[in-house]
């Protein structure tokens, strides 16, 4: 109901938490009266939190020895990193599937129009996963690093993954009459990333590479290990180009063309000697097909956000580096120019050549 010109059927920002059961919002205009109460009951729907902007060490109590350094000083020996918010995005037909790192999975239905918001997949889908990927050939949705009990986030297993029934976003319980199922990878401590490749899905842990292939009923998908000691450094640090996979590891660059190979890199020491390992999960990979180049955007050791790029020409086998902050990159497959994003919430139309051309940012 409208009370004194105030319409509560709107979107608001919470400006103050009063106590455990109440908060304050600010309306965009003044009320036309001074009614103290009324208007009936209110049902509120909340957006998810934006998550941390940067990764930080999780300095737990008891790190290092008693009396080391000064009170309140963070101890750099902590091995726990609290990752910045990352998203995985993929198409399921015309719709968008989005998963927040260690969070829920959401569907944006394009038929509802651009002003509608993405919604949760519902109560039958896992409540927490590391990331998602759609098998476009078989029309299954994969959730990696997900829950062994779909309703319990505390059962999230970083090496466990599920796939939905074919053509379904809500059927995750395996049955004799569907193709839903699950598998677990053995080598590593967590699944880091995955890309679709020719005839299979390539999945990396922090230690190894695995291939996921469709095998039909009753198992639907099977897995086999393709490489060891060749883990992925970040969720978005791998890419497939014409059936060959290229990725950035913790201390070297690799490729897979049927066999895992460590790539000779003339700038390897320059990159890894000045890399922020705290913020390594921000690393993003893209390909510029016009110039046969793969780019890895990464944060330098003194940065909290991406500020550099290392580039590999996969036809010439050459490398170079530069200073450029991009958080994602899409080559000019669909649009006239490549499209990229940067940390200040801008969408950037990149020039196809850098000579005398300035990239134009657009707010998003």
Which residue stretches match the model-derived regions?
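A short beta-strand motif characteristic of beta-propeller blades
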Residues: 72-75, 117-122, 178-184, 222-227
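Beta-strand initiation motifs
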Residues: 112-118, 170-177, 217-222, 262-263, ...
């Amino acid at each position: 109901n409208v009370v004194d010109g105030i319409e509560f059927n709107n979107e608001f920002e919470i400006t103050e938490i009063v106590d455990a059961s109440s908060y304050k919002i600010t309306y965009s205009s003044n009320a036309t009266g001074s009614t103290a109460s009324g208007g009936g009951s209110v049902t509120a729907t909340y957006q998810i939190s934006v998550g941390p902007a940067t990764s930080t060490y999780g300095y737990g109590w008891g790190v290092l020895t008693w009396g080391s350094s000064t009170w309140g000083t963070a101890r750099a020996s902590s091995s726990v990193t609290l990752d910045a918010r990352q998203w995985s995005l993929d198409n399921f037909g015309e719709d968008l599937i989005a998963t927040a790192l260690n969070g829920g999975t959401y569907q944006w239905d394009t038929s509802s129009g651009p002003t509608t918001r993405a919604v949760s997949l519902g109560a039958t889908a896992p409540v927490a996963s590391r990331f998602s990927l759609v098998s476009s050939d078989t029309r299954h949705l994969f959730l990696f690093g997900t829950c062994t009990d779909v309703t319990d986030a505390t059962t999230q297993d970083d090496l466990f993954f599920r796939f939905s029934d074919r053509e379904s976003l809500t059927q995750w319980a395996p049955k004799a009459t569907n193709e839903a199922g699950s598998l677990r990878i053995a080598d590593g401590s967590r699944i880091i990333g995955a890309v679709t490749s020719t005839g299979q899905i390539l999945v990396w842990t922090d230690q190894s590479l695995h291939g996921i292939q469709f095998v039909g009923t009753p198992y639907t998908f099977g897995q086999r290990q393709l490489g060891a000691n060749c883990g992925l450094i970040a969720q978005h640090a791998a890419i497939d180009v014409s059936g060959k996979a290229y990725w950035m590891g913790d201390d070297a660059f690799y490729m897979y063309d049927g066999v895992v190979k460590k790539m000779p890199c003339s700038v390897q020491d320059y990159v890894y000697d000045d890399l922020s390992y705290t913020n390594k999960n921000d690393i993003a990979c893209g390909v510029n097909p016009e110039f046969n180049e793969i780019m890895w955007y990464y944060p330098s050791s003194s940065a909290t956000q991406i500020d550099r790029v290392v580039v590999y020409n996969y036809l010439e086998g050459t490398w170079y580096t530069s200073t450029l902050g991009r958080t994602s990159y899409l080559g000019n497959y669909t649009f006239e120019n490549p499209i990229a994003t940067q940390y200040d919430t801008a969408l950037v139309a990149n020039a196809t050549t850098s000579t005398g051309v300035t990239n134009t940012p657009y707010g998003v």
